[in-house]
A protein has these predicted regions:
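Divalent metal-dependent phosphate-bond-processing catalytic cores, especially two-metal-ion Mg2+/Mn2+ enzymes
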Residues: 1-7, 15-202
């Protein structure tokens, strides 16, 4: 089986996947900056929810005892794990999307994998994808107290297609082309969902 990741990278990625949304406030960073000025100041207004999730995840990882030099890990290996966890979590900030895709380096592989997993519902069966779409719209309505992305009780499919074409397909294409052997179906499945959503635009 062909792979581009060593076991330590895989471990780091799994930790990042578990913790990347541990401080998801249910709103975007712009709304969070307005509601939590203290967090905005703490992180200089950059990647707020991702920054908090990163800090919490690393603190829990250190407290867990999983990274101990007496368990055979070297200082450089511990630093490597913490770096991969941190950069992978921070890469899920969509405002950094273009910047992250352009890196296209071996070190960026974990970030692309995590971003793909974060957006993976676009590559799921249609009925599963629709559940995620409606859940996301409900979350936005609850937390922003306005109808975001919804018109007369229906999903704004034009906005959904724009999001997918801007963020999702490019991420999956990068995954398929540069990171993971055999991941092309994710792109094809997502493309099919996007085309079906495009048919619903009114």
């Amino acid at each position: 089986e062909e792979t581009v990741m060593d076991p330590l990278s895989v471990f780091s990625l799994l930790v990042a996947a578990i913790g990347h949304d541990c401080y998801h406030p249910g709103c975007d960073n712009a709304t969070l900056a307005k509601d939590r000025v203290d967090i905005k100041r703490r992180y200089n207004g950059q990647s707020l929810s991702e920054m908090v999730s990163c800090e919490v995840t690393l603190e829990l990882l250190r407290r867990s005892g999983a990274l101990q030099s007496d368990d055979g890990l070297t200082t450089s290996q511990i630093a490597f794990v913490e770096d991969v966890v941190a950069t992978s979590i921070l890469s899920t900030d969509l405002s950094k999307h273009e910047e992250n895709l352009k890196k296209n380096t071996a070190e960026n592989a974990a970030q692309i994998v995590l971003k793909s997993a974060d957006l993976a519902h676009f590559a799921r069966p249609r009925e599963v994808h629709l559940k995620w779409v409606h859940a996301a719209m409900d979350e936005q309505r609850r937390n922003t107290k306005r109808q975001v992305g919804v018109k007369d009780g229906h999903v704004d499919w034009k906005n959904q297609v724009f999001f997918a074409e801007t963020f999702v397909l490019s991420t999956f294409a990068t995954l398929s082309g540069n990171v993971s052997v055999g991941s092309t179906p994710m792109y094809e499945y997502a493309k099919t969902n996007v085309e079906k959503s495009r048919e619903l635009i009114v």
